[in-house]
Amino acid sequence: MIESVHFKYFRALRDVSMTLTPLTVLVGPNSSGKTSVLAGLNPRFSVSSRVASHNVPIIPPSDYWKQNPTDEFGIQWQYGGNRSGRLSRRPGFTIGHKTQPLTLDLQELRSENVLAYANSLSPTGGNLTNVFSTLTRQQQASVANELCRLVPMFSDVDLIPTQSGKHQLRFQDRWNADLWLTPSQVSDGTMLILAFLVLQYQPDPADLITIEEPERALHPYLLDELIQLIRKMTTGEIGKKPVQFVLATHSAELLEYVRPEEVRFLTRAPEDGSVQVNEAPTGSTNWQQVYKEYRESLGSIWLSGNVGGVPGR
């Protein structure tokens, strides 16, 4: 597990250190630096993987603070067991974790797929059909049963060939067994929940999964269920091994289902626009009093602006 990370002159992160928990939630307004943090947690995705001589990474100017490649760029990760990894312009960089970045696209999730083996969900979710197809029959049945529990308008999920020679998902209507709906006929939330449910069955899971705006199109009840699913994956209760998660959100509702110590509030410094990361001061008496006054509503505390991460406050 990544216990902490330090960013130096990386995108919007001029000099930022932050600790991570098994589940960490980044919250803040638009352009507050959440995407920069997620990119820095997945250097193979955000920074050119091409390597020059002497094992030195080629870092594009767009990845530097203010796009100034003369700055001393660097990212350092601290893992459990006193292990560490780093990425910089110096020779001999090391990366000790594998990241699966997810920015799920609703149109991509609905796409037909050319039949192929797919053991992990792609960043946009465009291979969801193939990922579901690759699952064992028992795993498919488990995913279908869980989806139908969470979205009780359906009684099954299946695959069907299309006229184009591809295949696509289909959803059986709960009240009419002869009626099967295509992905274009079901809700956005249905497609997103299905994508989240298949993550637990990836045979070679990443060490870290990052998700941008997981709350989109989900009923508050489903947000609670999603966080419970993620917690089970972080402990290894489900899945091949424990997986760490970092979520980026604008949702006060989602904050109601996580713990204060799991949240990082992001803001921009008014002087130079650099990102600032604050943790909830859970150990202070004042915080505990405020938390009680807000009836332990983390979303309400965030919207009040008292802990940062709100535009103009």
What are the residue ranges of the model-derived segments?
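Switch/communication elements of ASCE P-loop NTPase nucleotide-binding domains
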Residues: 1-45, 168-170, 174-312
